[in-house]
Structures are given as structure tokens and as C-alpha cells.
UniProtKB/Swiss-Prot annotation:
Belongs to the HrcA family. This is Heat-inducible transcription repressor HrcA. It comes from the Bacteria. PANTHER family: HEAT-INDUCIBLE TRANSCRIPTION REPRESSOR HRCA.
Length: 344
């Protein structure tokens, strides 16, 4: 059966109405609201054809139609009108990123808050791969607690790690400063993934005259080697799914919330999408268990042309796709610009 212009108009009207109301759509509703220039009977016949083509579904015998995953896909690829944020919204995004944020964790956490706020969907983000990062700086600092010190490690991707550790009796601030110098001299510029295999003998030898520091060095190195080597996952607005009528079923809600709570599950979303550009996965196009009734939209962000990670959102298949896409594009651009400033 051929998809002609009238069928396209009917399909677009059904999808737009269903996205707006969440209720199955009948032919009379389309005739009344969308001024297609044909009778309800003609629209009804077109809707029956669209159902036969797999683009619409009829959830109940006497109800109207709703879009299928295939129908949404056709709409997104062929029929969806372009959408843009208003100048006021674009300025709002810029202002949010103009806040003083010194660490990449702050920037990505703010990014997920912003996406969730502007779309009312669950927002997710994948940070830079720390396995490919290197150690930029390490400091061991005294703190106002007996026998404690603060280890601060900064990576080349802007991630800052903090660790509090116990130090031996008699270790002075001058000793901690010496340890910092030795660690920086030996470890600065090393890839994090290489730290586990590095030879420690040089460091132990250099600090050998300070016997009470040897054990501290060992503990410090253990802390450094425990730095996360994978991409960190950020999320916000996961409870937004409770506001969607599709997710009123408690078992389905539990399944989705459980999925959103698992870092590794969210990483799989990003790892199964192309590394660059915008990707839209609708319903069963998501081959990951737990989200086959959802749509996922992701987009990459970059620093000086190098892809660093991805941001995205998860919501019902009855998603305002054009709005979601325009928000993600604007946010990804602002995020990339912010990170370029941060890395300088």
C-alpha cells in the first residue's frame, strides 16, 4: 500500500494529537481539529489503511488509534516539523552555563538538571572516559583532623578526586609537601589506565630515608590506583516518568526506575548508539531490556572537535520529539563551549 500525501497528513495529525493529549485519536477528532479538507469517513478509511501498514494501532475495539513504534519512526524521519528554542530559552541556557563551575562533575550535573527541567523527561549524561585520561596533578594536604590528610588528584579531563586518608604519627606538613612533589614528579602525565601497572620502586627508594612515610606512600598510591577508570554517569529527573500516563502500571514503573538507577545500564544506552551526532531510538528499537516502551534521544558533545561524551533523555514513545531534539542540540553546544573554557 502506497503512502500518499493524504495519509501523511492524517498520520501526522494523529501523532501530534496523541502526543498532546495521551488519548487514542478518532477520525472525528482529526476532522474537527486539523482541517484536512476531507470527511470523517475518509479520515477513518485512511486511518484503517495506516493501521494495516503498521503505522497505527487500535488499543481497544471501540477506541481511536494510537501511533505504533513504526509510526513514530516515520513521523520523526519524514513528517516532523523542525522546532527551535526561543531566543529567551537560548539565553536561559547560556546563563545557566555562565555560573562559576570549576569541575567537570559540576558542569555535567548542571547539564542533566537543565535537560530535565526543560523537557520534563529523565536526563542522562556520560562523562569523559577516564581510562584515556592522564593524571594532571596530585596534592597531599594537611587538614585540621589528627592523623588525617586530604589527597586531591586532578585528571586531564577536568575530573577532581578527593580522598581522606590516615597518616602515621609524626608526619608534618613539610613531609606531605615532599610526598606531593615526589608523586607529581613520578606520576604527572601518566595515563590512569597505566597507573595499575607502573613500577613503584623508584618512589619507595626516593622516600626511603623517611621510614614513617613509606606506609603512607603505599596508602596514597592505593588511593590513586582506585580512581574510577570508566565514564561517569549522571542523571536527573528520573521521577518524571511518574507524570506520564503510559507509566501508571506499577510493575513497569519499577522496571524503568530500576533501570535508571544502574550506571552500567545507562552506559549501555550510550555505548549502543553512534559515537557522534544525534540518535533517536523509539520503543523496541531499544534492544536493552527494561526500556522497550521508551524513547531515548542522545547527542554527543565535544571539546575542540574531539568527542568527549554524550548527553540524552529518556521518556515515553509519546515524546515531544522536536522539543527534545532542540533542547539537546542547544544544551550540547553550550556544554561543549563551557568545557573548552574549563580545559584551557
Amino acid at each position: 500500500m502506497r503512502m500518499d500525501e493524504r495519509k501523511q497528513k492524517v498520520l501526522a495529525a494523529v501523532i501530534q494529537d496523541y502526543i498532546l493529549t495521551g488519548e487514542p485519536v478518532g477520525s472525528r477528532t482529526i476532522a474537527r481539529r486539523y482541517n484536512l479538507g476531507v470527511s470523517p469517513a475518509t479520515i477513518r478509511n485512511e486511518m484503517a489503511d495506516l493501521e494495516e501498514m503498521g503505522l497505527l494501532e487500535q488499543p481497544h475495539t471501540s477506541a481511536g488509534r494510537i501511533p505504533s513504534d513504526q509510526g513514530y519512526r516515520y513521523y520523526v524521519d519524514c513528517l516532523m516539523p523542525p522546532a527551535h528554542l526561543t531566543p529567551e530559552e537560548e539565553e536561559y541556557v547560556r546563563r545557566r552555563y555562565n555560573q562559576k563551575m570549576l569541575e567537570i562533575e559540576q558542569v555535567l550535573a548542571e547539564t542533566t538538571r537543565l535537560i530535565s527541567e526543560m523537557t520534563s523527561y529523565a536526563a542522562i549524561a556520560l562523562g569523559p572516559d577516564q581510562g584515556r585520561a592522564s593524571l594532571e596533578e596530585v596534592q597531599v594536604l594537611p587538614i585540621q583532623v589528627a592523623n588525617k590528610a586530604l589527597l586531591v588528584a586532578v585528571t586531564s579531563t577536568g575530573v577532581v578526586e578527593h580522598r581522606v586518608l590516615t597518616i602515621p604519627e609524626g608526619v608534618t606538613p613539610e613531609d606531605l609537601n615532599r610526598i606531593s612533589r615526589v608523586l607529581n614528579a613520578r606520576l604527572q602525565g601518566r595515563a590512569l589506565e597505566d597507573l595499575r601497572q607502573m613500577v613503584l620502586s623508584d618512589i619507595y627508594q626516593e622516600l626511603a630515608q623517611h621510614r614513617n612515610l613509606v606506609n603512607l606512600v603505599r596508602d596514597l598510591l592505593q588511593q590513586l590506583l582506585s580512581l574510577e577508570s570508566g565514564e561517569r554517569v549522571y542523571r536527573n529527573g528520573t521521577l518524571n516518568i511518574l507524570n506520564q500516563p503510559e507509566f501508571k502500571d506499577l510493575d513497569r514503573v519499577r522496571e524503568i526506575l530500576s533501570f535508571l538507577d544502574q550506571d552500567e545500564a545507562l552506559r549501555r544506552i550510550f555505548m549502543t548508539t553512534p559515537s557522534t551526532g544525534l540518535t533517536i531510538r523509539i520503543g523496541q528499537e531499544n534492544k536493552i531490556e527494561g526500556i522497550d516502551k521508551c524513547s531515548v534521544v542522545t547527542i554527543s558533545y565535544a571539546v575542540e572537535g574531539k568527542i568527549m561524551g554524550k548527553v540524552g533523555l529518556l521518556g515515553p514513545t509519546r515524546m515531544q520529539y522536536s522539543r527534545a531534539i532542540s533542547v539537546l542540540r542547544c544544551v550540547a553546544d553550550a556544554l561543549s563551549q563551557t568545557l573548552e573554557q574549563l580545559y584551557r
